[in-house]
Amino acid sequence: MYQRMLRCGADLGSPGGGSGGGAGGRLALIWIVPLTLSGLLGVAWGASSLGAHHIHHFHGSSKHHSVPIAIYRSPASLRGGHAGTTYIFSKGGGQITYKWPPNDRPSTRADRLAIGFSTVQKEAVLVRVDSSSGLGDYLELHIHQGKIGVKFNVGTDDIAIEESNAIINDGKYHVVRFTRSGGNATLQVDSWPVIERYPAGNNDNERLAIARQRIPYRLGRVVDEWLLDKGRQLTIFNSQATIIIGGKEQGQPFQGQLSGLYYNGLKVLNMAAENDANIAIVGNVRLVGEVPSSMTTESTATAMQSEMSTSIMETTTTLATSTARRGKPPTKEPISQTTDDILVASAECPSDDEDIDPCEPSSGGLANPTRVGGREPYPGSAEVIRESSSTTGMVVGIVAAAALCILILLYAMYKYRNRDEGSYHVDESRNYISNSAQSNGAVVKEKQPSSAKSANKNKKNKDKEYYV
């Protein structure tokens, strides 16, 4: 249609259309091109609006106020059941170690960990994060008596959280998600309800953080020491130095498969597969580029569906405590109905003077679950709702482009019709003038030769008479 309109404009501007037609053609060309381009831009704008989704937050009753968190839906490439980068840890044990550069060690108030695994062990250490030497802060994901649990210490006491209902050493594929905010923690295995942990002395941390902003910097250390003496729970994981995967160094080597590890914005297994300079691999560790195999066909399907929740999109936001209470007991509905929306947020830069090194904000991630079977989400969680109105932009763009094309076509037809009528009248007038001119000229031309002949005849006759 665009080429047809250009040809119409060219016809309007041709010399056969006269001066009026040429001006109309030039005017048509001036308007056709920008209007058509604007229509195409309208279509593009409408199509681009499809990627936007409305974000809704559901806040339930919880102990702490939750800071709004931006959520983005995982792209299609991450929702196809792919388990991400997978490593097999064979008999004898192996280890993958990531070390932060000395000048880039983060101190965080909140941490996010997600990983998929399959094993038959009753005792093993999957992942451990340690602070710099001498500080003593750590976070450890482990298997104890066939149950998954996390233990961490951020400067006060060891805090432990465990899922005692789920059996995870059955050789099937499982996904575990852990979040920490200060001394609070949540843990979820597959589609089981979220477990919470609120240590003693941690009820007023948010108000304390606000009040500490008004305390002079030189007095911050004194206040922290006083609070520590009073049993106050500290909240900062200081100067994180290493991430150790496999547990060989802790004397409890892991045997099985680990997939899609994510910790505070770092996809460590992906980095290991890409030969990152900060990663070292030792022992019996082998890279596998496929979804983890399992003992049965049922567990294979479970692996592919469950891993849909382990791939993570990142965004930088501020995160406070966002926890959920225990829900109902798990149902027997398939895991394939779990959500594939993963929530990621950066850990807030601590205002706590507990930090030993200067704080640098670091990114973190939170796997945000919903209830199985399509029921309402857990309190305090957030859910992405894709509304049908997301196609409104595309519809508006297409309608606008179609309207512009129709107007341009009508305008071109109108100018083309006027050009035809004008050329007819002009040609008729020109023919009349030329015919009259030709008739007058013919009469004159006919008269002039006859007079010349008569003059010559008279002269000849006179000569003849003269000589005779």
Swiss-Prot record:
This is Neurexin-1-beta. Its main location: membrane. Ca(2+) binds at D137, V154, I236, N238. One of its GO terms (molecular function) is cell adhesion molecule binding. Keywords: Angiogenesis, Calcium, Cell adhesion, Cell membrane, Cell projection, Glycoprotein, Heparan sulfate, Membrane, Metal-binding, Phosphoprotein, Proteoglycan, Repeat, Signal, Synapse, Transmembrane, Transmembrane helix. GO terms for cellular component: axonal growth cone; cell surface; endocytic vesicle; endoplasmic reticulum; excitatory synapse; GABA-ergic synapse; glutamatergic synapse; inhibitory synapse. Neuronal cell surface protein involved in cell recognition and cell adhesion by forming intracellular junctions through binding to neuroligins. Plays a role in formation of synaptic junctions. Functions as part of a trans-synaptic complex by binding to cerebellins and postsynaptic GRID1. This interaction helps regulate the activity of NMDA and AMPA receptors at hippocampal synapses without affecting synapse formation. NRXN1B-CBLN2-GRID1 complex transduce presynaptic signals into postsynaptic NMDAR response. It is a single-pass type I membrane protein. InterPro entries: ConA-like_dom_sf, Laminin_G, Neurexin-like, Neurexin-related_CASP, Syndecan/Neurexin_dom. It is found in: Presynaptic cell membrane. Gene3D superfamilies: 2.60.120.200. The modification Phosphoserine is found at S450, S451, S454. Glycans are attached at S346. Residues 87-285 form the Laminin G-like domain. One of its GO terms (biological process) is synaptic membrane adhesion. Residues 350-381, 435-468 are annotated as: Disordered. Changing N238A: Loss of NLGN1-binding. No effect on CBLN1-binding. PROSITE patterns: LAM_G_DOMAIN. O-glycosylated; contains heparan sulfate. Heparan sulfate attachment is required for synapse development by mediating interactions with neuroligins. It holds the Pfam family Laminin_G_2. Belongs to the neurexin family. It comes from the Eukaryota. The chain crosses the membrane at residues 393-413. Residues 1-46 form the signal peptide.
